[in-house]
Amino acid sequence: MCSGGIMKIRYAKKSEKEIAIKFWKDSFKDSEEQIKFYFDNIYNEKNYLVLEDNSKIVSSLHENDYIFNFNNESIKSKYIVGVSSDITMRNKGYMSKLLIAMLENSKKKAMPFVFLTPINPKIYRKFGFEYFSNIEYYNFSVEELANFKLPNNEYSYIEINEKNKNLYLNDLIKIYNSNMKDNFCYLERNNFYFDKILKEASSDEMKAFILYKGKKACAYIIFGLYEENIEIRECLALDNISYKEILALIYGYRDYYKTVNLASPNNSSIEFLFENQLNIEKIVKPFMMMRVLNPLAIFKNLKLENSNIKIYIEDKILKENTGLYSLNNEISFSNITEEKAVYDLKINIADLVFLITGYFSIDDLVKLGKINIKNKNIIKKLNKIFSKKNSYLYEFI
């Protein structure tokens, strides 16, 4: 794959699982339950990329398989987690070599992009990653739920556990999909992925409930009870009434827990379900970063033929991406230098993420100095092509 002298990058052998576990324990603060969950349910040596120096593994990362729904198309991608180096071998450039090898590998596997949740975004920007999705966090007193009523007619709240979960996976998927339909980009969840989410929640000592009204599944909630706080990891419903009804369940814990912290998709405006918005603290944080590996494939996915724009992209890591992309009656690429290229706009590979996912509007990108537009008359046209959009990804591994 990649080797220079005594350095070698490869996927792990079956016998190296213990090494992977040690790396994880040395680098992250996860509990024994969380580590056990990961290595029992998700870890796969075929996705564990390691860098060896003198036959010793000194740096590693995990590439976990996911299917993105990106502009209504199912796309295979990798969620990069557990990026770490041997504590005694840091600052030797191992991590950089490993990340670049991962990007090159993923591109060879025909993946248009990969994604990760950074501990420090500054590190990953150097490799062309940029944010493309936010999460909203709402903090409020449990008493704010006092007016949220239980359903009137025939209803049931069912706690989902290891024994009964298979009965409810399809209904969880239906509620999830109904919430995703307006998102430009989200992770597809089938039975396997929902099962993983429930196991992960359980390893984090969380509970999951689903609300039925009559025979219809209307909402679900995944939450944990910690000290004086109720942490809601995910709460999705078919409509705002069902949303309030599933939150009414949480009010039942009011004698023991004082505050609620609720995570929600971007632009969900949950504060307006409450009577007093000023009592609801809302914090919006960037959550997930993407790295575009193949701009041509993305422009085709976005169906940008006949847009009649020319975009010059600069990629300092995967240099073969640098060049002119012409979105005419067909989408073409030419690796000419910037001096020779005639283009409408210039952008680097990281900021391209903002553009293609609609994280920012064109006007925002101009204000932030993230895009260089040669011809100002084209801004109106660009605003039509690259509109602002929402994405939802709230996975941890």
Language-model regions: role of each:
Residues C2-G5, E18, S156-I397:
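Intrinsically disordered, low-complexity, positively biased terminal segments
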Residues S3-S60, N64-D65, N72-Y79, A146-N191, ...:
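Short amphipathic alpha-helix that is part of the acyltransferase structural core
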Residues F68, T117, E130-N147:
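Conserved catalytic-core motifs of GNAT/GCN5-like acyltransferases
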Residues M89, S106-K107, I250:
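Hydrophobic pocket-lining residues that define ligand/cofactor binding sites across diverse proteins
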Residues M89-A101, M111, I241-E245:
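Conserved acetyl-CoA pyrophosphate-binding loop and the N-cap/start of the following alpha-helix
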Residues K108-P112, P118-E136, N267-I283:
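Conserved active-site alpha-helix within GNAT-family acetyltransferase domains
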